[in-house]
């Protein structure tokens, strides 16, 4: 009996023990690992994973490996090595791991965010970037779209003058409408039932993906009942059903001579491919309805929750740092005043605000470990070999909290991004990659930066953002899911007296 058990264990150890492709090569240091479960028993069980990986650097160095179940994962925690992965060898490491939950979210690895490297991903990323080029000038200028939604947001917040509210949903609505206009020229009115559907499925997906899922480490577990997986499937289906409805309705309106949004760009590419008018890289199979909807879903999902979350982080840090908030009010009053609304051109004048946004993106990065990469070929990082198929995680948290790169990295200090006189923005460290870099960098970076600047400039021009009367400050601990979320909090909204007086004077 025991002989059979021993034989079984030896067989499993042989099958699942990591095998080196290049026996003589030098590999990164590795945590202890066991057959089947890998390094899981030896990883810290409490605290945020990004911070735990950061702490492990003290023992294993800025690059090391762990066995996540049966897969080898290399953790990179230094900016030079990170840029080697993302930029210098970006093509080598531009793959995406196959993960059960993300396969569900991406309709079996379609779209952009979670699709593996290949012709499909390259095509859809190129088409998505072409879409953003549509919004550079004229009536469709990105700034104009953002400002019209922020104006509606501010009007709504003004109805809560003197009240203590959670700004999450109002900000979500504004940013959802910006993305919706970019994707398919739709802007939702407050109270629209479709808007509630978007909000609910978005929260459901993020909540499902945020739970530690053994099925991602051990895919064979998906044959067993799994409430989290079922919840994810349910919300993804809701998303897909809504996008399909919008897509089918839009097909009747599509005009190839009027390309104004992302759905137009994708549909035109599909039409050209079907008619044989496209290049060899534009296979019609890569532009099926399912492919198109998944790409729209990616842009919609990634563009909404990330920016909404960062706006809330900025407000939270300002509530904790009233001296910074006071300086921001002074900066806006002196450089913009109240006779006009802020514009993107004000970024050259509102330097402290821009520095504040950069500091929040440093101290609370949207994705503390980015989205995992995968080695497409046998390659290397620094002096270490990395085998094809190895998963690679860039620990952005480590880059942004390295004491050798940042003075007091755990302290909120927007002034670190300004010269001593406060008259010029600077880059205090190369260890700063809030939007990633290279082939897999965030394609919505320009949009996100404009949204963050304009939303905060408009809010600070019009409203006093105050700690509630009960003195309850937001928690800055955070909740790392797909996006590094901040726990719900409330802020007291008061229309600024100077703004009210300026509006009254302007109307007379």
UniProtKB/Swiss-Prot annotation:
Regulated predominantly by intracellular cAMP levels. The 17,20-lyase activity is stimulated by cytochrome b5, which acts as an allosteric effector increasing the Vmax of the lyase activity. Pfam families: p450 (PF00067). Substrate binds at residue 202. InterPro entries: Cyt_P450 (IPR001128), Cyt_P450_CS (IPR017972), Cyt_P450_E_grp-I (IPR002401), Cyt_P450_sf (IPR036396). Its cofactor is heme. A cytochrome P450 monooxygenase involved in corticoid and androgen biosynthesis. Catalyzes 17-alpha hydroxylation of C21 steroids, which is common for both pathways. A second oxidative step, required only for androgen synthesis, involves an acyl-carbon cleavage. The 17-alpha hydroxy intermediates, as part of adrenal glucocorticoids biosynthesis pathway, are precursors of cortisol. It comes from the Eukaryota. The keyword Hydrolase does not apply. This is Steroid 17-alpha-hydroxylase/17,20 lyase. Keywords: Endoplasmic reticulum, Heme, Iron, Lipid metabolism, Lyase, Membrane, Metal-binding, Microsome, Monooxygenase, Oxidoreductase, Steroidogenesis. Pathway: Steroid hormone biosynthesis; Steroid biosynthesis; glucocorticoid biosynthesis. Heme binds at residue 442. It is found in: Endoplasmic reticulum membrane; Microsome membrane. It catalyses: a C21-steroid + reduced [NADPH--hemoprotein reductase] + O2 = a 17alpha-hydroxy-C21-steroid + oxidized [NADPH--hemoprotein reductase] + H2O + H(+); progesterone + reduced [NADPH--hemoprotein reductase] + O2 = 17alpha-hydroxyprogesterone + oxidized [NADPH--hemoprotein reductase] + H2O + H(+); pregnenolone + reduced [NADPH--hemoprotein reductase] + O2 = 17alpha-hydroxypregnenolone + oxidized [NADPH--hemoprotein reductase] + H2O + H(+); 17alpha-hydroxyprogesterone + reduced [NADPH--hemoprotein reductase] + O2 = androst-4-ene-3,17-dione + acetate + oxidized [NADPH--hemoprotein reductase] + H2O + 2 H(+). One of its GO terms (biological process) is glucocorticoid biosynthetic process. GO terms for molecular function: heme binding; iron ion binding; lyase activity; steroid 17-alpha-monooxygenase activity. Belongs to the cytochrome P450 family. GO terms for cellular component: endoplasmic reticulum membrane. SUPFAM superfamilies: Cytochrome P450 (SSF48264). Its EC number is 1.14.14.19, 1.14.14.32.
């Amino acid at each position: 009996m025991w002989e059979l058990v021993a034989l079984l264990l030896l067989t499993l150890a042989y099958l699942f023990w990591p095998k080196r492709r290049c026996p003589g090569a030098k590999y990164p240091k590795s945590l202890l690992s066991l057959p089947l479960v890998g390094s899981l028993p030896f990883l810290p069980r409490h605290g945020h994973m990004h911070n735990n990986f950061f702490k492990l650097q003290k023992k294993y160095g800025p690059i090391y490996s762990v066995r996540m179940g049966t897969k080898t994962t290399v953790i990179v925690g230094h900016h030079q090595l990170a840029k080697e992965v993302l930029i210098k060898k970006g093509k080598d490491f531009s793959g995406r791991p196959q993960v059960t939950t993300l396969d569900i979210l991406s309709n079996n690895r379609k779209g952009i965010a979670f699709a593996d490297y290949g012709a499909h991903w390259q095509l859809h990323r190129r088409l998505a970037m072409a879409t953003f080029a549509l919004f550079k000038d004229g009536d469709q200028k990105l700034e104009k779209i953002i400002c019209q939604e922020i104006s509606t947001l501010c009007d709504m917040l003004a109805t809560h003058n003197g009240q203590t509210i959670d700004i999450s949903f109002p900000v979500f609505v504004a940013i959802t409408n910006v993305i919706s206009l970019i994707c398919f020229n739709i802007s939702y009115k407050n109270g629209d039932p479709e808007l509630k559907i978007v909000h609910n499925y978005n929260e459901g997906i993020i909540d499902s993906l945020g739970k530690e899922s053994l099925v991602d480490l051990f895919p064979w577990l998906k044959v067993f009942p799994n409430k989290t997986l079922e919840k994810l499937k349910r919300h993804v289906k809701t998303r897909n059903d809504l996008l399909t409805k919008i897509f089918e309705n839009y097909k009747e309106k599509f005009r190839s001579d009027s390309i104004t949004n992302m759905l137009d760009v994708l549909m035109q590419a599909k039409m050209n491919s079907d008619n044989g008018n496209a290049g060899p890289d534009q296979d019609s199979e890569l532009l099926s309805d399912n492919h198109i909807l998944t790409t729209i879903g990616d842009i919609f999902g990634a563009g909404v929750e990330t920016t909404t979350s960062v706006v809330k982080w900025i407000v939270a840090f300002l509530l904790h740092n009233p001296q910074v908030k006071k300086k921001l009010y002074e900066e806006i009053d002196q450089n913009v005043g109240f006779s006009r609304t802020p514009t993107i051109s004000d970024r050259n004048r509102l330097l402290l605000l821009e520095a504040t946004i950069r500091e929040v993106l440093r101290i609370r990065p949207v994705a503390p470990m980015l989205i995992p990469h995968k080695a497409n070929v046998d390659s290397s990082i620094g002096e270490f070999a990395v085998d094809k198929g190895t998963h690679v995680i860039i620990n952005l948290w480590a880059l942004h909290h390295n004491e050798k790169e940042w003075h007091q990295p755990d302290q909120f200090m927007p002034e670190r991004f300004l010269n001593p006189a406060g008259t010029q923005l600077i880059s205090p460290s190369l260890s700063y990659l809030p939007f990633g870099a290279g082939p897999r960098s965030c394609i919505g970076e320009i949009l996100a930066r404009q949204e963050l600047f304009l939303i905060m400039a408009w809010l600070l021009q019009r409203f006093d953002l105050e700690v509630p009367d009960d003195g309850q400050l937001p928690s800055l601990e955070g909740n790392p899911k797909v996006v590094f979320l901040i726990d719900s909090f409330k802020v007291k909204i008061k229309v600024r007296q100077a703004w009210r007086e300026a509006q009254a004077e302007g109307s007379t």
